[in-house]
From Swiss-Prot:
Its main location: cytoplasm. Belongs to the PTH family. Coiled coil: none annotated. This is Peptidyl-tRNA hydrolase.
Length: 188
């Protein structure tokens, strides 16, 4: 089984904000793979299907970003999945807007959603797809920036990054993640 989780904040207020780019990617995967997100349990919205012969679970935690681990740990337990079955998609301030970077493990890097996951999973060893949202300019506070909407100029870059994320997730169904990581990171 493959569990793909996109991190974000629930509710209309946060739709299409920089911090919710993980949710955007899950929505796109849901459309591409025809997996309806129709279950609400474990503080999450999720759906299950089969893609390329593999059982896939797409998840959007409905906890706030900083509590994402409270949703994903119980889902992994319920479906008898492990951290090695998990791929997490989330925003990254340290990457330029629209760039993606894949990693197999690492620290939280200041991202509270990832910090929560590491705490609840008991390990930093899970696959990640980071989508760059850039850094705030002109003295804007980070919290205001990540909870703000993408500008008209940023939107096409984010749409492209979400498309690349879908392709990376598709590739990881048939190839080892390390191989997918090397392929996609080389083209960043």
């Amino acid at each position: 089984m493959l569990v793909i989780a996109g991190l974000g904040n629930p509710g209309k207020t946060y739709e299409n904000t920089r911090h919710n780019v993980g949710f955007m990617a899950i929505d796109e995967l849901s459309k591409e793979w025809n997996i309806e997100l129709n279950k609400t349990k474990f503080n999450g919205l999720y759906g299950m299907g089969f893609v390329s012969g593999k059982k896939v679970l797409l998840v959007k935690p409905l906890t706030y970003m900083n509590l994402s681990g409270e949703c994903l740990r119980p889902i992994l337990d319920y479906y008898d999945a492990d951290h090695e079955d998990l791929k997490v998609i989330y925003d990254d301030l340290d990457l330029p807007t629209g760039k993606i970077r894949l990693r197999t493990k690492g620290s939280a890097g200041g991202h509270n959603g990832i910090k929560s996951l590491i705490q609840h999973l008991g390990t930093p060893e899970f696959d990640r797809v980071r989508i760059g949202i850039g850094r705030p300019v002109n003295g804007m506070k980070v919290v205001d920036y990540v909870l703000g909407a993408f500008t008209k100029e940023e939107a096409p870059h984010i749409n492209d990054a979400v498309s690349k994320t879908v392709k990376a997730c598709e590739a990881s169904l048939t190839k080892p993640f390390l191989e997918v990581m090397n392929e996609f990171n080389a083209n960043v």
